[in-house]
Amino acid sequence: MRFPDCGRKDLKYPEWTPVLKNELSGNVGMLELIRRKDRFIHVPYHSFDSYIRILQEAAINKEVKSIKTTLYRLAKDSKVVKALINAARNGKKVTVVIELLARFDEASNIDWSKKMQDAGIRVIFGVEGLKVHSKITYISMKTGADIACISTGNFHEGNARMYTDYMLMTAAKNVTRDVSLVFDFIERPYSPVRFKELLVSPNEMKQKFSRLINEEIKNKQAGKPAYILIKINHITDPVMVKKLYEASSHGVRIDLLVRGNCSLITGVPGVSDTIRINGIIDRYLEHSRIFIFANGGDEKMFIGSADWMPRNLDNRVEVIAPVYDPEIKADLKRVVEYGLKDTLQGRVVDGTGENRPWISEDKTAFRSQEELYKYYLNENRIKD
């Protein structure tokens, strides 16, 4: 569904052409670039074509044994599916986990499923009793140098032009191993699986997030750096809300970017004094989930598909991945910090429903989406 074109260019936003990152657009293949170091794209500021290139290269690479991916929503003329079909025709073992209960996309997903099955792709229709909402791709290599992509959003070209989403591309063995185990869990539902790196629901995600918050409380009590920064769509899970209140009651600083539903109330004496929440509504739908914990000065960062809602943490297969690369961690921090100081499109989320504009101490105007786009443009010129 797209907004109709009324022929009024003066009512449209100026064009922001997605940046094709120089480091991902040279003669070196995407698979080799990812093997060298972790990579990322932040759509729609960056071009989604980088991910499509991964699939297109994997489809013809003789070292690729198999490709597994989850699909939740698909574009009408999906290059993602076309690349997967090409891979199957080239003899790769391709497995697609597609969610037939993706709201508003049921008919489209059924149609694509038939086309993929006709091409020889193994199609799995989710897990009984759970909705598969994770956004992961796993590419198995004959050499053992496997590759994984973990995204906060759908592998959907249309969404990638309108939703802000983050994608991590990695060859780190501990992470790729865990991603392969997620597919094992989906293929053999409810089998016992232990994940070393990933936070996976409904297995242990809520417990692991709770432990991360507990560490911030301990560090605050020990006089170490302690804070929590989260960018998310919704926070309504009672357990996670109580954990944030508990951390705040111990003096842990908590800064949140929440676009949608939020059960937290800020400024309650002794309960949520140290919590502040900003919400951004702008030209792009804020959709990425980013989690940052001070960890005593050695920050831990994560990205993934899960909001803090009961349905995500208890009734869906969701994946949150750690981020270790210093460059990517710096960018994640920038994204959250820019959002927290957005005075033009940001609004105070305080439980009153007033949606008061966010006003900085120095009263300067700052629009986070525009500033991020400018940053990525300039960064690309510098690295050219």
Region roles according to the model:
Residues 1-228, 246-250, 262-384:
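N-terminal localization/anchoring segments of enzymes in phospholipid and broader phosphate metabolism
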